[in-house]
Amino acid sequence: MKTLLRRIRPAVRLVAGVTLLATVGCRPSPETTRSEQRRAKPDFVLRDNQTHNKFSRRIAPALRVPSGSIIEAFAHEATGGQFTIGSSDPTDLNMDLVHTLTGPVYVEGAEPGDILAVELLEIEVGDWGWMAIIPGFGLLADDFGPTKVLRTFALDKSSDAIEYAKGIRVPFRPFAGVMGVAPATDEMLGTGPPRANGGNLDNPHLIVGTTVYFPVFVPGALFSIGDPHAAQGLGEVAGTGMESPMRFVYKIRVIKNGRSIEEVQYETDAYYATTGFATTLEEAAKKATRYMIDYLAEVKGLSREDAYMLSSLAGDLEIAEAVDKPNMLVVMHLPKSIFANAR
């Protein structure tokens, strides 16, 4: 692409996140650190040159591991190394090379119909990051038209926040924007939207201490991780968070003979969550709600009527991602504290 340099002024414009559904009850806490961790010694290591940027069962695994393994994985920022801290034009980018994912990991014993559990143990942000306004991308792409802005940031290892501008500090809350397993297709699917296999979830709740559940579609599951964010708001309205290289440590295991799930679900000590993707927020919200009803009926033994009403009483619907066309992602969180046997 033709490079057009743009001078980035110190003054910035902040755009408030727009809430389109009932939200907030489980919104990410601002209290965090640059490096979040539950330390564990890894059994295997994946480097940032062991990558791909599609989802397909035809992609050969970079690693084969037994269920229960702990893996350390290094990931590029979203452009796969095309941007550096000295970059200035967000359109000077080959979109065919973005979202390099570290993996895939073949998990021994994983079969279609199983669930793959990925427990996030450590996340460490790199020393720089970037944000951008890219023409044609983002929730307000029509409003901003041809405007293009790329800002890069030095990230301080000793700090707990990003120095966005003078007097504006945004707490670190690192997570992987893309996580997923291989779909049951030979087609090479792009990593742009969220799908049933995971993909571009862009969900800032998926931090250390979260266990993410994926339906398994192919033998070995073929799990990959990437598109790291040092921080991001729910919805990712401008199309990017704080994109940064990152180090992940996660435990991966197969769950057999359990209940089946159709899309990604996750939990922490505090809540259980379901997700729904669709081309509209309304349909995504309906799917996330239906999956929560399924969970309450199958795991907690409630009637579907009681599960529906409890979801209305205690569940929180949130927009996780609203910009990765053609799909959007809505999540529902239900606090575990409402149950008498809560941990």
Residue spans for each PLM region:
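Bacterial lipoprotein signal-peptidase II cleavage site
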Residues: 27-33
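Alpha/propeptide regions of enzymes that mature by internal proteolysis
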Residues: 38-50, 56-61, 65-72, 93, ...
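C-terminal motif of bacterial Sec signal peptides marking the signal peptidase cleavage site
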Residues: 23-25
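Bacterial N-terminal signal peptides that target proteins for export
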Residues: 3-15
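Conserved mixed alpha/beta catalytic, RNA-binding, or beta-rich assembly cores of soluble enzyme
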Residues: 174-200, 204-282, 293
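Intrinsically disordered, low-complexity linker/loop segments enriched in Gly/Pro
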Residues: 122-208
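Short, Lys/Arg- and Gly-enriched loop/turn segments at beta-strand edges
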Residues: 78-90, 123-133, 220-230, 320-323
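Long, compositionally biased
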Residues: 325-343
